C-alpha cells in the first residue's frame, strides 16, 4: 500500500523514561546533536498505534548533551508521564527547515537510480557514512539474485540530478559486467 504524503512522519526519537515529579519525560533522540529534537514542536507521539499531538512546553539537554528531557503540554505528573515510556516521537516533513541541497538523506531512500545511458540501476536502500563521502547503496533484483551497488554521493561527479518529488536520481555510473574478465 502506498502511503500518502499526509501519512509520512519522520521519527526523531522515543520517550524512554520519566524525569522528576511534574510530568517531564526523558528522550532518546536520533537528532545530531541530540538536543536538536527540542527545535521541533509540536511532536507527534505514537500511543497504542495512534499518533497524538503534543506541544513541547520546555526542554533541555542533560549530562553535557548526552540526554534530553522535555515537558509536554498536558502531561503534568509522574504517573501520566510513565504511560508514554516507549512511545515514538515524530514530526511531519513540512516541519523540517529547508536545506542547501534541497533534500534530506532520508528522502533518498526508495529513489529509483538510473545512469546517464538510461540503465536502471535499482533503488536506494541505504546511505552509508564513510567519512570522506557518503555512499548510496542501490539494490536491484536480477536473474542472478539481488545486486547491490555502492555509488559515492558526490554531486556533479557521480550524482548528476536528484528529484525527490518524483523519487528519481540520475548518476554517471555504470555497472560492471560480472562475466567480463
UniProtKB/Swiss-Prot annotation:
Keywords: Chaperone, Cytoplasm, Ribosome biogenesis, rRNA processing. It is found in: Cytoplasm. The keyword Ligase does not apply. An accessory protein needed during the final step in the assembly of 30S ribosomal subunit, possibly for assembly of the head region. Essential for efficient processing of 16S rRNA. May be needed both before and after RbfA during the maturation of 16S rRNA. It has affinity for free ribosomal 30S subunits but not for 70S ribosomes. The PRC barrel domain binds ribosomal protein uS19. Binds ribosomal protein uS19. PANTHER family: RIBOSOME MATURATION FACTOR RIMM (PTHR33692:SF1). Belongs to the RimM family. This is Ribosome maturation factor RimM. It comes from Hydrogenovibrio crunogenus (strain DSM 25203 / XCL-2) (Thiomicrospira crunogena). The gene is rimM.
Amino acid at each position: 500500500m502506498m502511503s500518502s504524503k499526509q501519512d509520512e512522519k519522520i521519527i526523531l526519537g522515543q520517550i524512554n523514561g520519566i524525569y522528576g515529579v511534574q510530568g517531564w519525560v526523558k528522550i532518546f533522540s536520533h537528532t545530531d546533536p541530540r538536543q536538536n529534537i527540542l527545535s521541533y514542536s509540536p511532536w507527534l507521539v505514537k500511543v497504542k498505534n495512534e499518533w497524538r499531538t503534543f506541544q513541547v512546553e520546555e526542554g533541555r539537554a542533560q549530562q553535557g548533551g548526552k540526554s534530553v528531557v522535555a515537558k509536554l503540554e498536558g502531561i503534568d505528573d509522574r504517573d501520566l508521564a510513565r504511560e508514554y515510556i516507549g512511545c515514538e516521537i515524530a514530526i511531519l516533513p513540512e516541519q523540517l527547515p529547508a536545506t542547501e541541497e534541497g533534500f534530506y538523506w532520508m528522502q533518498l531512500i526508495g529513489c529509483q537510480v538510473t545512469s546517464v545511458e538510461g540503465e536502471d540501476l535499482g533503488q536506494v536502500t541505504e546511505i552509508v557514512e564513510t567519512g570522506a563521502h557518503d555512499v548510496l547503496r542501490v539494490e536491484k533484483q536480477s536473474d542472478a539474485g539481488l545486486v547491490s551497488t555502492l555509488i559515492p554521493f558526490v554531486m556533479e561527479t557521480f550524482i548528476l540530478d536528484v528529484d525527490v518529488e518524483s523519487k528519481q536520481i540520475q548518476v554517471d555510473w555504470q555497472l560492471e559486467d560480472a562475466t567480463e574478465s
